[in-house]
């Protein structure tokens, strides 16, 4: 009897699962992070922004413009059309506005066009200018009030406070070494804290002491805060002091000072806490939070009946708090109202809630705890009560009452998703528009003006365009494979506007925090400078309305102490209050705990407790990790560094022609593929009526017919072939949301990133030294690891000053054989096989007309001859771009296609390359066990098993022990057993097969109990000395292929100023011979080799042309001249006003001629290469060179010097 139980993944794949935990909760939809947020933006976000900014009134108050509602019209293009036409998938937005004339009472309502709003596709991406983009969610500090505690050099604790808004000025409190408290308003110089208290309208020292109670730090601060100007009251002086800090050097009056302070903190238009900021402040300052664990210094009674709730000297425990909580929420319990001075920033009474407790430092001393009262959630600005309560908390910290905050705690960091980021951008545009509307209101005639005339939509359109086009968070979607797409949509970045920067982020921010548990994946993060700043959402996590990440837990009943199936989603803040058991904790059938002592989590500690202490239990072990990490079998047996690489490398797997699902999976593959957006999903249940490679038709139960079109070989963002193949047969019954067609890297509706080759862990002739991989030729012959890359090339025919460019077959000086694959219009035919340098689109551009002589003008007038020439600017296949022409698209103005200004025709040619696995390609398993292919060995030479089967891949066993990714060995053995038994298995992370399960399955498959076998050498037939581990592992081919990296240059472009070769494959550059390489040649004394490297091969402009000429003619190479870099140095020194001359050995000045002065030495290499054939025309070539090249050289100084077969305008991608 086999271990585990059978589970169906979709209709087409069955796996034997080793999971021992019942799944209480289904995975949420994995792209909801994006789609739900955008839906919120459309439903509520847009309205919120309009409500914030409208109504807009003019300065006199005669006119007022109000928002009534908005609607989106039908998008101009569908998703596929937008992709094809390089357009944006967007819907026109019309806003209904109401203009009221307050004097006449006349109302005008009008629908105003507000630009196109980009729409989200069903899978959570946007199409902008034809490219698929993702808006990455941002992880930022939540608005709220934060307290920090630090120790100075004397060991005394110093506290600081920051009040952070969503937008607006910061407020900071701090103590110094002398125990004086200060405030900084909006990052300015500090003032005594009591100045801010006085500005709230609490003027005298005695009032301040009454309000906050006597303490050392308060007394020191009052001593520091002296009354300077007796003409002003203390309140007026305080307000002026703050004004002086904010606007130094400006004349200050009480009124202007008051209005400035009001505008900075208390004006809802300028200061916004957002609902989350208000929620955090209310939570932090409320007495519910602050009383817990304190000793009461007064008796608390019911205000209605006088019944005692808690006596003096009671310690507030959970039980006491349960009784107190309802009273603390009441508006008549322990409320105190202070009447501020009329000169304060706000004259309204300030109501707070106050309760006295004993100090933790001096138990005899009473400390007053003050909360901000009950402020409604829609009050998004600060109130004086907030300021006073936050100061009270700050003073209480000195008495060890209250807690400091950890900024890296996920209760203090929140997620800004697409909807919110887009809303902020929309708000910026609308605020800019508001200014224009106000101005226009005062200029135009109030009787005739309409809403349309007041609105200028340019700022709104511009700010949305800018966001999608150039924001750091709007990213080109990763489309190597569906897992990459899905992960990109679930990514959380701490970078971007309003976030951190790479250089300023320290270790603390990047580190794994205990609150990441079940919220952010501790494994999946990039390896480079962004490590820890870019994270991935955990698989079961959701984001609440405030932007905090919540994770699900099973509730444990308080009465029975049994685990229920009731699920609660907890934020990191809430989770801190509970003790939580792990998902692997053994349970009885009735839900009670088997053991008397349970290992559980409490905040950052692991504790052992009895079952009655447990509040919650994890839902499932894989809730800790992200989707990509959850796809790694035996993750629990891998070292975390290698697991990180494994998670990241799966996203780089190349889509293969015929992928196979992994024999050893985790059960996550089906959902990952289903939710990625690459699979074709049934919209409704029904029966399949027709299937072919391009279309599937399904008849619903109510008789309607659904038609689904499959994607065929579409080029993805990363030049991969995205191709869909049917997953259903004629007559199949389909349920809603079934996978009816596999996308790329999918098999039977599951993610299938690679293949399942037979792998042996053994060395072979040193071919797998240092992570190199040795492959069998079978993998090449049978196209096991063959993928398709599709690249697109564009050619545009524009209007130039000298006339329009023309796409044509008539090209100057081009032989017929070069045109054999072009059609009558000069465009390559679909299906043609093209190689480097072949013409794809024939195009000619008018050349400059030379001055005509009188006779030529006469001839031109008589015969109408075209006197001006054209030059060939055809689109050619770039280096390494050869392949089969897969598709050609032609867009013209006449056909009504939208082209950029000045373009008449655009041709796009798609070239597909079939790439077999070869030496130099990168491969990897799912455990970070990556390597490059070092040898492809004939099948007959490969080591073979006792039954004669040659192995497919040999990996070096030395790659395992030091890296500690043992998961690959367990996968290898289980994979071998699964293939033998003809089954697929699932081993979910942290809850899958253990070692015993693996060996049991190996035994049942009839494999030797050590999992090893004798291996024979394919060349000699001799057995190797030791037994070898052989099995089946899911192995991937990664996107880093040698074809994309290999590069060589003989002749190519040079940099304009230095005249040295460019660098890099994209620029067709040379290899840099650097400082240290020069030392090496110097050490060898290779003087002539070094000289030619520093002159002809680099920047001796004249010398290299002459050298080329000499090589072509077979003559001796002349001596080199002066390198251009020397001339650049001289010119730089001359530009500093130094008189630099170059002298020879006899102290005679050497003339450094400018490049375009003597152009006979700047012959184009094109003409030189022809010289070899036509040396007799040498004189003529020089003559024409002298006259014509002067003009040409000025124009072409920045052109690459290239032989005849180099194209002038390089294909720029």
UniProtKB/Swiss-Prot annotation:
GO molecular-function term, one example from the UniProt record: ribonucleoside binding
Biased composition annotated in UniProt, kind: Basic and acidic residues: 1171-1199
Family: Belongs to the RNA polymerase beta chain family.
Top-rank taxon, per record: Bacteria
Catalytic reactions of this protein: RNA(n) + a ribonucleoside 5'-triphosphate = RNA(n+1) + diphosphate
Binding partners and assembly: The RNAP catalytic core consists of 2 alpha, 1 beta, 1 beta' and 1 omega subunit. When a sigma factor is associated with the core the holoenzyme is formed, which can initiate transcription.
Record keywords: DNA-directed RNA polymerase, Nucleotidyltransferase, Transcription, Transferase
Region (Disordered): 1169-1213
Protein name (record): DNA-directed RNA polymerase subunit beta
Source lineage: Bacteria, Bacillati, Bacillota, Bacilli, Lactobacillales
UniProt keyword Chloroplast present: no
Function, as annotated: DNA-dependent RNA polymerase catalyzes the transcription of DNA into RNA using the four ribonucleoside triphosphates as substrates.
Pfam families registered for this protein in UniProt: RNA_pol_Rpb2_1, RNA_pol_Rpb2_2, RNA_pol_Rpb2_3, RNA_pol_Rpb2_45, RNA_pol_Rpb2_6, RNA_pol_Rpb2_7
GO cellular component, one term: DNA-directed RNA polymerase complex
Provenance organism: Lactobacillus helveticus (strain DPC 4571)
EC number(s) reported in the record: 2.7.7.6
BP terms from Gene Ontology: DNA-templated transcription
């Amino acid at each position: 009897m086999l271990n585990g139980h059978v589970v169906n993944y979709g209709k087409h794949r069955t796996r034997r699962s080793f999971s021992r935990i019942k799944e209480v909760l289904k995975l949420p939809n994995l792209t909801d992070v994006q789609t739900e947020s955008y839906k919120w933006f459309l439903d509520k976000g847009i309205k919120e922004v309009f409500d914030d900014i409208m109504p807009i009134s003019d300065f006199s108050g005669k006119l007022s413009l109000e928002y009534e509602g908005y609607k989106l019209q039908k998008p101009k293009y569908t998703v596929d059309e937008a992709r094809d036409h390089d357009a944006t998938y967007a819907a026109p937005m019309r806003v209904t506005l109401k203009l009221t004339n307050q004097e006449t009472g006349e109302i005008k309502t009008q629908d105003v066009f507000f630009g196109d709003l980009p729409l989200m596709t069903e899978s959570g991406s946007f199409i902008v200018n034809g490219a698929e983009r993702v808006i990455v969610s941002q992880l930022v500090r939540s608005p709220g009030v934060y307290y920090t505690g630090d120790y100075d050099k004397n060991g005394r604790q110093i506290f600081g406070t920051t009040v952070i808004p969503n937008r607006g000025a910061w407020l900071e409190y701090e103590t110094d070494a002398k125990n004086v408290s200060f405030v900084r308003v909006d990052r300015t110089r500090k003032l005594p804290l009591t100045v801010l208290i006085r500005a709230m309208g609490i003027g005298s020292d005695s009032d301040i002491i009454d309000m906050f109670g006597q303490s050392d730090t308060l007394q020191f601060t009052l001593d520091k805060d002296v009354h300077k100007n007796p003409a002003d009251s203390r309140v007026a002086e305080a307000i002026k002091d703050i004004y002086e800090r904010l606007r130094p050097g400006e004349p200050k009056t009480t009124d202007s000072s008051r209005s400035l302070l009001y505008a900075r903190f208390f004006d809802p238009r300028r200061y916004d806490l957002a609902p989350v900021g208000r929620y955090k402040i209310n939570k932090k300052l409320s007495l519910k939070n602050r009383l817990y664990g304190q000793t009461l210094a007064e008796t608390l009674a019911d205000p209605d009946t006088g019944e005692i709730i808690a006596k003096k000297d009671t310690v507030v425990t959970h039980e006491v708090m349960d009784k107190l909580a309802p009273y603390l929420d009441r508006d008549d319990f322990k409320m105190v109202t202070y009447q501020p001075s009329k000169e304060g920033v706000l004259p309204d009474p300030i109501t707070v809630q106050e309760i006295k407790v004993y100090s933790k430092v001096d138990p005899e001393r009473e400390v007053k705890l003050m909360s901000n009262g009950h402020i409604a959630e829609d009050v998004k600005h600060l109130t004086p009560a907030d300021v006073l309560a936050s100061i009270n908390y700050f003073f209480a910290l000195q008495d060890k009452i209250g807690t400091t905050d950890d900024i890296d705690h996920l209760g203090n960091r929140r997620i800004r998703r697409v909807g919110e980021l887009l809303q902020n951008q929309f708000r910026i545009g609308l605020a800019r528009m508001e200014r224009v509307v106000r101005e226009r209101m005062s200029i135009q005639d109030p009787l005739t003006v309409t809403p349309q005339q007041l609105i200028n939509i340019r700022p709104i359109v511009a700010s949305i365009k800018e966001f999608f086009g150039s924001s750091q968070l709007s990213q080109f979607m990763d489309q190597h494979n569906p897992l990459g797409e899905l992960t990109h949509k679930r990514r959380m970045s701490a970078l971007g506007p309003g976030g951190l920067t790479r250089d300023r982020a320290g270790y603390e921010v990047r580190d794994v925090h205990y609150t990441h548990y079940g919220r952010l994946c501790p494994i999946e993060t990039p390896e480079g400078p962004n490590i820890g700043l870019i994270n991935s959402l955990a698989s079961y996590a959701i984001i609440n309305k405030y932007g905090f990440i919540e994770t699900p837990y099973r509730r444990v009943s308080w009465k029975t102490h049994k685990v229920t199936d009731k699920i609660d989603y907890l934020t990191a803040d809430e989770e801190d209050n509970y003790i939580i058991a792990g998902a692997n904790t053994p349970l009885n059938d009735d839900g009670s705990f088997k053991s008397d002592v349970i290992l559980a989590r409490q905040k950052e500690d692991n504790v052992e407790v009895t079952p009655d202490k447990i509040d919650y239990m994890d839902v499932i072990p894989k809730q800790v990790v992200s989707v990509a990490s959850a796809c790694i079998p035996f993750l629990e047996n891998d070292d975390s560094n290698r697991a990180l690489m494994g998670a990241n490398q799966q996203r780089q797997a190349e889509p293969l022609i015929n992928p196979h699902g992994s024999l050893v999976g985790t059960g996550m593959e089906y959902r990952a593929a289903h939710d990625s957006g690459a699979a074709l999903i049934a919209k409704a249940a029904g029966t399949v009526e027709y299937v072919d490679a391009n279309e599937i038709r399904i008849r619903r139960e109510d008789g309607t017919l659904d038609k689904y079109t499959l994607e065929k070989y579409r080029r993805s963002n990363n030049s991969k072939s995205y191709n869909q193949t049917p997953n259903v047969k004629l007559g199949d019954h389909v349920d809603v949301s079934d996978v009816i067609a596999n996308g790329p890297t999918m098999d039977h509706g599951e993610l299938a990133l690679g293949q399942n080759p037979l792998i042996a862990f053994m060395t072979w002739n040193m071919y797998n030294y240092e992570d190199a991989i040795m492959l069998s030729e079978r993998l090449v012959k049978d196209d096991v690891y063959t993928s398709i890359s599709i690249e697109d090339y564009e050619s545009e025919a524009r209007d130039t000053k000298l006339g329009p460019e023309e796409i044509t077959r008539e090209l100057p000086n081009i032989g017929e054989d070069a045109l054999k694959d072009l059609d009558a219009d000069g465009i390559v035919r679909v299906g043609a096989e093209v190689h480097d340098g072949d013409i794809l689109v024939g195009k000619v551009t008018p050349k400059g007309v030379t001055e005509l002589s009188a006779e030529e003008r006469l001839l031109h007038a008589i015969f109408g001859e075209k006197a001006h020439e054209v030059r060939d600017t055809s689109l050619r296949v770039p280096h390494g771009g050869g392949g089969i022409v897969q598709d050609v698209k032609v867009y013209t103005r006449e056909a009504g296609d939208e082209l950029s200004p000045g373009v008449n025709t655009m041709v796009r040619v798609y070239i597909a390359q079939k790439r077999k696995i070869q030496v130099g390609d990168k491969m990897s398993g799912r455990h970070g066990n990556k390597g490059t292919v070092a040898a492809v060995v004939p099948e007959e030479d490969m080591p073979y098993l006792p039954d004669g089967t040659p192995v497919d891949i040999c990996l070096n066993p030395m790659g395992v022990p030091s890296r500690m990714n043992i998961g690959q060995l367990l996968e290898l053995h289980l994979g071998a057993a699964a293939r033998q038994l003809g089954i697929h298995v699932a081993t979910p992370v942290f809850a899958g097969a253990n070692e015993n399960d693996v060996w049991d399955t190996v035994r049942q498959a009839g494999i030797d109990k050590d999992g090893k076998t004798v291996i024979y050498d394919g060349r000699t037939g001799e057995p190797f000395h030791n037994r070898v581990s052989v099995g089946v592992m899911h192995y991937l081919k990664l996107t880093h292929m040698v074809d994309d990296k290999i590069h060589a240059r003989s002749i190519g472009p040079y940099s304009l100023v230095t005249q040295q070769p460019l660098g890099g494959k994209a620029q067709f550059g040379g290899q840099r011979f650097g400082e240290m390489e020069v030392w090496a040649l110097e050490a060898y004394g290779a003087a002539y080799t070094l000289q030619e490297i520093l002159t002809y091969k680099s920047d001796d402009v004249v010398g290299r042309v002459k050298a080329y000429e000499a090589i072509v003619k077979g003559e001796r190479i002349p001596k080199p001249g002066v390198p251009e870099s020397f001339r650049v140095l001289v010119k730089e020194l001359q530009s500093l006003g130094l008189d630099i001359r170059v002298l020879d050995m006899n102290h005679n000045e050497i003339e450094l001629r400018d490049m375009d002065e003597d152009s006979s030495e700047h012959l184009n290499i094109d003409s030189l290469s022809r010289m070899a054939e036509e040396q007799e025309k040498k004189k003529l070539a020089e003559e024409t060179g002298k006259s014509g090249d002067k003009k040409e050289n000025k124009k072409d100084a920045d052109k690459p010097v290239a032989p005849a077969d180099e194209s002038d305008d390089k294909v720029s991608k």
